[in-house]
Regions:
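Residue-level structural signal for beta-strand termini and adjacent loop
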Residues: 201, 373-375
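Hydrophobic positions on the alpha1 helix immediately C-terminal to the Walker A/P-loop
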Residues: 185
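Flexible phosphate-sensing "switch/lid" loops adjacent to ATP/NTP-binding sites
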Residues: 1-174, 189-348, 356, 363-365, ...
Length: 487
């Protein structure tokens, strides 16, 4: 895989920049964490070389000075809000996040329950946390938030909230999902720290949009494609331009809320230490791009992948035409078509030739490998076999899994488990390959190539089953599909 991003440089300069921001205040910084921390696959796709856990690696250089506070809304507890990607409720995800952080050596200080208005379920959750030895605090609903600045920055506003006791200089504020109240928790803490004579600071840690790349740079356009369902729009930060005469990129919601934040900072400090929403950020991603051409191409392919993702969601009834239209507009801005993604062209050509469901993968060296469905294998399962055979130097005509082994598996699926599709999925093929690898050298060689599929791109002419999607995700492969259900 061609590298476009210097991951080691990023970890070094990003952690250093955060230290510098801490030093600007009284040795106390509340850092609102936006986006994904554990598995930032979007960043790894548009910035080849960026590792999905890069942010964790970077923060590991600051472990001794970090305290993590996890935020959850009482309203989300009350309605049992679920994380769609994990299938667990937000209140359970708080515990999962806490465990993940602690397993990696980070100190998790407490949980803040926001939007509290006496909800019984939120009170019960607080008691549950206490029984587990976890500190929790309540932050209350404030009438007119965020626009009633006079009330918010007063003892009847932020002053009513529990003061969250923290012991370290960098407090990372995170949450299971958006709308949890992370920013309000940070601002409330600034108010209450200030009342105690501590001039604490606030900063926002978001990777995208990249503030020091051009507005229409493919990396930034790819961010708009990723948030098309939210209708986020990248913009030139007018406050930054007015203050410095320099162009910086931010997104519409950050720019729209800045006048309110400006007034709140003035209410807390007497002045605003930040002249623009961009100033509030600490993002150093743009300085770590080492090959712009590679990142541009990867981002263009990601925009195409997002388009297919939206069309697939529409078929499932989970997306609307507006999201698709937004991405098609981004196609024009990036000057791309679906053919920009080479594996897309190859898969569609294969289907025309064979007349059945097909798929294609672009390997890290640019080689295209194709497959199609058969009576024995689905096209995704066949693709994994074809790709690993190629990488292992095994002749394409070699059958890694004999038909005599596949047919009993098919019989079990249909006759005993009540399945309708006899073709083997990717997980079943990998299990079979694993069993055979103990006695078959070719199967062993093919299995050993699985790590080399990470970062590769796949396109399928039919929508994938959930199990195939999960396997591709675990292998680190970017997948797109035509919006056609497999029959």
């Amino acid at each position: 895989m061609r590298i476009g991003f210097d991951n080691d440089k990023y970890c070094t300069i990003q952690s250093q920049h955060i230290r510098e921001r801490i030093a600007q205040f009284d040795g106390k910084l509340y850092l609102e964490l936006g986006g994904k921390l554990f598995d930032d696959h979007h960043a790894s796709r548009v910035l080849p070389g960026f590792q999905p856990d890069s942010k964790l690696r970077m923060f590991s250089q600051l472990t001794d000075c970090i305290e993590i506070v996890i935020v959850i809304s009482a309203e989300d507890i009350e309605r049992n809000k679920v994380r769609a990607d994990l299938g667990i409720t937000y209140d359970e995800d708080v515990l999962r996040l806490r465990g993940e952080f602690m397993d990696r050596g980070f100190f998790v200080g407490s949980v803040v329950i926001t939007h509290y208005n006496g909800q019984p379920s939120a009170k019960a959750y607080s008691e549950r946390l206490a029984n587990m030895g976890i500190k929790s605090y309540f932050h209350y609903l404030i009438d007119g938030y965020p626009h009633n600045v006079a009330l918010i920055a007063s003892d009847e506003g932020f002053g009513k909230n529990d003061y969250v006791e923290t012991s370290r200089e960098l407090v990372i504020v995170t949450a299971p999902g958006p709308g949890s109240g992370k920013m309000a928790v940070c601002l409330s803490q600034l108010y209450n720290e200030n009342k105690r004579g501590v001039r604490a600071g606030y900063a926002k840690f978001e990777t995208f949009p990249v503030w020091n790349l051009p507005l229409k740079h493919p990396v930034n356009i790819a961010y708009e494609a990723a948030t098309a369902d939210l209708n986020d729009v990248n913009m030139i930060d007018p406050f930054h331009f007015d203050a410095y005469g320099k162009v910086a990129i931010n997104y519409n919601r950050a720019i729209e809320i800045y006048p309110v934040l400006n007034a709140l900072f003035e209410g807390i400090y007497g002045e605003n230490p930040y002249k623009s929403p961009t100033d509030m950020g600490v993002n150093m991603v743009g300085y770590s791009i080492c090959d712009d051409e590679v990142c541009c191409q990867a981002s263009k392919e990601e925009i195409v992948r997002r388009y297919y993702e939206a069309t697939n969601k529409q078929v499932e009834g989970a997306s609307n035409q507006g999201e698709i239209n937004k991405i098609l507009l981004l196609f024009n801005q990036a000057k791309i078509t679906t053919d920009t993604r080479r594996c897309t062209v190859a898969a569609k050509n294969r289907q025309k030739e064979r007349g059945c469901a097909s798929s294609a993968i672009e390997l890290s060296d640019g080689t295209i490998i194709c497959s199609n469905s058969s009576e024995l294998l689905g096209c995704s399962a066949a693709l994994i076999l074809n790709a690993t055979k190629h990488l292992a130097g095994i002749d394409h005509d070699v059958k890694l899994i004999p038909q005599s082994m596949i047919e009993p598996i098919q019989k079990t699926k249909i006759e005993y488990l009540g399945g309708k599709n006899p073709r083997l999925h990717t997980d079943e093929v990998l299990v079979a390959l694993s069993v055979l690898s103990d006695t078959d050298e070719n199967c062993k060689k093919a299995l050993e190539q699985l790590p080399n599929l990470r970062g590769c791109q796949v396109h399928s002419t039919v929508m994938l089953s959930e199990v195939d999607r999960k396997i591709f995700k675990k292998l680190g492969i970017g997948v797109s599909c035509e919006p056609v259900k497999n029959k």
